[in-house]
Swiss-Prot record:
UniProt-annotated binding residues for (2E)-4-hydroxy-3-methylbut-2-enyl diphosphate: 41, 74, 124, 167, 225-227, 269
The protein's name in its UniProt record: 4-hydroxy-3-methylbut-2-enyl diphosphate reductase
Note describing how the cofactor binds: Binds 1 [4Fe-4S] cluster per subunit.
Function: Catalyzes the conversion of 1-hydroxy-2-methyl-2-(E)-butenyl 4-diphosphate (HMBPP) into a mixture of isopentenyl diphosphate (IPP) and dimethylallyl diphosphate (DMAPP). Acts in the terminal step of the DOXP/MEP pathway for isoprenoid precursor biosynthesis.
Amino acids binding dimethylallyl diphosphate: 41, 74, 124, 225-227, 269
Gene this protein is translated from: ispH
Length: 316
C-alpha cells in the first residue's frame, strides 16, 4: 500500500504564532494563563497546553482580576475586547493577522456607513468575532452561507454594500456565493485580495492533487476545525472516500483493506506529530514509505508580540 502526503499540510503561520503566544506566556509568566476559547481548533494542541497550565474559558467573567488573558487565533468582537479592557487584566492577542485584516475591512465599512455581508459559517468563533467589528446603527451586517441565503437577503441600500469572507472556507463554495452576491447586488464591492487565507487555499489545492492519486484520503484534524472539514469535503467531492480523524487511533483497518494508495493531509491547526503517528499506523497496516507530493512552499512567519519573544528577553 502506497502512502502519499499532501504538500503543504498542517500548521500555518497564524496557528504557529497563536500556539507560541500561549507557550511563551506560560514560560514567562507561569501558570495559570487564561485563553478565551480554544486557541486553535485541535484537541491535541489544546490538551497539551491545558496540561502546562492554560485554562480555556468562553466568558471574560471567568477570568480573575490581575491575571493574563489571551484571545484565540479566531479573533474576538469589539464587545469582548472592550470587556477585557475594562478589567484588571494583561491581555495578549493571538488573533491571526489574516483574520485581523478582515476585521479591519468590516470596521472601515462600518465607519463609512456601508452595509456589509460576511460569507461564513454561523456559530464559528471567527464569524462571531468578525461580525462583532460592525457598530454603525445606520447600516447593517449580514451573514450568508450559501447562494440560497443570498436570494432571500434584504439590505437597506444596495448601492453602499460590501462583502468579506471567513478565512477558512471552501474556495469553490465561496466562489459560488460571491457570484450570487454580484448577480443580486451588482454594485457590491469586495476586498482587493481574497479573504480566504493562503494556507486554506494551498491546503485545498494540495488535497485536490492528493485525491487525484489516492483511493482513500485521511485528513488529520479535529471535528470543530473549519479548514480540516473543508479538506475532507473536497476529497469526497472528487469522488474519493475521505475520513476526518483526530489521530492515528481513529483509523479503522477496514478503511484501508485492499487499498492501493492512501493519501494523508492535515488541517492548518494539526501538528506534524499527529501526521507521523498516522503514517506509523498505516505502515503497521501494510503501508510503505510515506512519499510527499510536490506543492507550494510556504515561508510566511507571523511574529509574536515583543513582550512574549523569549529570545529578545534573553538578550535584554
Amino acid at each position: 500500500m502506497q502512502i502519499l502526503l499532501a504538500n503543504p499540510r498542517g500548521f500555518c503561520a497564524g496557528v504557529d504564532r497563536a500556539i507560541s503566544i500561549v507557550e511563551n506566556a506560560l514560560e514567562i509568566y507561569g501558570a495559570p494563563i487564561y485563553v478565551r476559547h480554544e486557541v486553535v481548533h485541535n484537541r491535541y494542541v489544546v490538551e497539551s497546553l491545558r496540561e502546562r497550565g492554560a485554562i480555556f474559558i468562553e466568558q471574560i467573567s471567568e477570568v480573575p482580576d490581575g491575571t493574563i488573558l489571551i484571545f484565540s487565533a479566531h479573533g474576538v468582537s469589539q464587545a469582548v475586547r472592550n470587556e477585557a479592557k475594562s478589567r484588571d487584566l494583561t491581555v495578549f492577542d493571538a488573533t491571526c493577522p489574516l483574520v485581523t485584516k478582515v476585521h479591519m475591512e468590516v470596521a472601515r465599512a462600518s465607519r463609512r456607513g456601508e452595509e456589509s455581508i460576511l460569507i461564513g459559517h454561523a456559530g464559528h468563533p471567527e464569524v462571531e468575532g468578525t461580525m462583532g467589528q460592525y457598530s454603525n446603527p445606520e447600516g447593517g451586517m449580514y451573514l450568508v452561507e450559501s447562494p440560497e441565503d443570498v436570494l432571500t437577503l434584504n439590505v437597506k441600500n444596495d448601492a453602499k454594500l460590501s462583502f468579506m469572507t471567513q478565512t477558512t472556507l471552501s474556495v469553490d463554495d465561496t466562489s459560488d456565493v460571491i457570484d450570487a452576491l454580484r448577480k443580486r447586488f451588482p454594485k457590491i464591492v469586495g476586498p482587493r485580495k481574497d479573504d480566504i487565507c493562503y494556507a486554506t487555499t494551498n491546503r485545498q489545492e494540495a488535497v485536490r492533487a492528493l485525491a487525484e492519486q489516492a483511493d482513500v484520503v485521511l485528513v488529520v484534524g479535529s471535528k470543530n476545525s473549519s479548514n480540516s472539514n473543508r479538506l475532507a469535503e473536497l476529497a469526497q467531492r472528487m469522488g474519493k472516500t475521505a475520513f476526518l480523524i483526530d489521530d492515528a487511533t481513529d483509523i479503522q483497518e477496514a478503511w484501508v483493506k485492499d487499498v492501493n494508495c492512501v493519501g494523508v493531509t492535515a488541517g492548518a491547526s494539526a501538528p506534524d506529530i499527529l501526521v507521523q503517528n498516522v503514517i506509523a499506523r498505516l505502515q503497521e497496516l501494510g503501508g510503505g514509505d510515506a512519499i510527499p507530493l510536490e506543492g507550494r512552499e510556504e515561508n510566511i512567519v507571523f511574529e509574536v508580540p515583543k513582550e512574549l519573544r523569549i529570545d529578545a528577553r534573553e538578550v535584554e
